[in-house]
């Protein structure tokens, strides 16, 4: 009798394990989707900062890559919250989230490519104030090179030592 009870217990244990696996399989897909979106957001923000460093005068170029990064971050957070939602919301929300995640990823790539295109097409006089400051620094450096006192400085010091001797 105990053998029969043990045999009946085993299938129910297997069934329970399969049900547990089926419940968490969808949750695992959501977790992978959330992590990929969070990584996209983390990767896009430094790109936006580097674009800003290349051309600080054009704010549009700086703001373009930040949009997909922020949207990817929000999608990742919503996806993590969706893992705790009831099953009905998971089924409908999963499809919407997968499509929106793909759209955000594609949007991030397109916007980043467009911002690089804008950087490559910028005119040389786009940042005129920066180039003027650079020219002023160059002129100041050339004035320092022309000062003859730097060459006579050590000789004056050496003659002062001779007079003391």
From Swiss-Prot:
Polar residues biased stretches: 155-165
Subcellular location: Membrane
Spans traversing the lipid bilayer: 31-51, 60-80, 91-111
Domain of life: Eukaryota
Main location per the UniProt record: membrane
PANTHER family: TRANSMEMBRANE PROTEIN 253
Protein name (Swiss-Prot/TrEMBL): Transmembrane protein 253
Native source organism of the sequence: Bos taurus
């Amino acid at each position: 009798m105990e053998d029969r009870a043990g045999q009946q217990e085993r299938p129910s244990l297997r069934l329970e394990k399969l049900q547990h696996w089926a419940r968490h399989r969808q949750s695992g897909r959501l977790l992978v989707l959330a992590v990929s979106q969070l990584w996209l957001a983390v990767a896009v923000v430094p790109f936006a900062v580097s674009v800003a460093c290349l051309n600080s005068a054009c704010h549009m170029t700086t703001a373009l890559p930040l949009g997909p990064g922020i949207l990817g971050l929000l999608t990742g957070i919503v996806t993590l919250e969706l893992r705790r939602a009831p099953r009905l919301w998971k089924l409908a929300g999963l499809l919407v989230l997968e499509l929106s995640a793909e759209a955000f990823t594609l949007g991030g790539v397109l916007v980043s490519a467009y911002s690089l295109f804008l950087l490559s097409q910028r005119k040389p006089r786009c940042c005129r104030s920066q180039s003027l400051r650079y020219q002023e620094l160059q002129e100041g450096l050339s004035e320092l090179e022309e000062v003859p006192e730097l060459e006579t400085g050590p000789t004056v010091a050496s003659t002062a030592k001779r007079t003391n001797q």
